[in-house]
Amino acid sequence: IRDSETSFYIIDKVSNESKLFEKTKKEIKYYKILFTVILIAILGSTFLYNRLKYFKAQNLHDGLTNVYNRKSFDIMYEKYREKDDNFALVMIDIDNFKLINDNYGHKFGDTVIKGITNTICVMLEQDDKVFRYGGEEFSVLIRNKFGEEVADIIDNIRVAIANKKWNDDVTVTISAGVAHISDSKDVLEEADKNLYKAKQLGRNKVVYK
């Protein structure tokens, strides 16, 4: 009888251990699946976040030049007007750009736009904001400098661009209008007026006041 009881005890113990082992295997499998799902969710969220970040950046930058676009300008300009009492706005236009496109082709026109963008960015400080405002027109927001100082900086850029050598010895020039917040609350309108004056004066000029 005792041997029989011992046998039943052993069988019962083995059976319980077998059930426990099967339960543990199921739990391990469950946690593996759960871990995989969580990992996929994390990776998916990271990928989605990076894609959204990329598309947001693309939405605020110009595709050709990689500087800020018109949408970015509208946002930053309003922020500057609301919060900053010492900033200048520059409106820049490539002179006779339609003739450049007509005579040398749009590919060369794109080269000119990229080259001028690069010159502007290199000659400005890191905190200055450069925008492709549209077509052959650019805008620049500069903080903590007064109008005369900004006009001098932009004139140096104008000279550098006029002296730049392009294909077939083509000469490209820019005109620019500068305005400061201390001169007018509507800085954009003032800068546009000064750009128009620069054009009227024969182009290849920077006008402030």
Task: List PLM regions with ranges.
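Signal-transducing coiled-coil linker helices
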Residues: 15, 23-63, 71-81
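Conserved nucleotide-binding and Mg2+-coordinating catalytic segments in signaling enzymes
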Residues: 55-75, 92-106, 114
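Short regulatory alpha-helical coupling segments
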Residues: 56-57, 70-86, 117-125, 143
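Alpha-helical scaffold within the catalytic cores of cyclic-nucleotide enzymes
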Residues: 117-118, 149-166, 192
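Catalytic-core segments of nucleotide cyclases and related cyclic-nucleotide turnover enzymes
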Residues: 151, 179-209
